[in-house]
């Protein structure tokens, strides 16, 4: 399950406008640079839930 903290971190990375949000390795790099290590790990284990959130805004 995707918690509120993960959602907020995804939105913060998106707001940087530094990458396409479907470029997951780039999202992980930006998240790491921002100190969002929980998001980096989440993306390793929950890519399907992440893509669903990006596409629909729902988790």
What spans do the regions from the language model cover?
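Short, charge-rich amphipathic interface segments used for partner binding and complex assembly
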Residues: 23-59
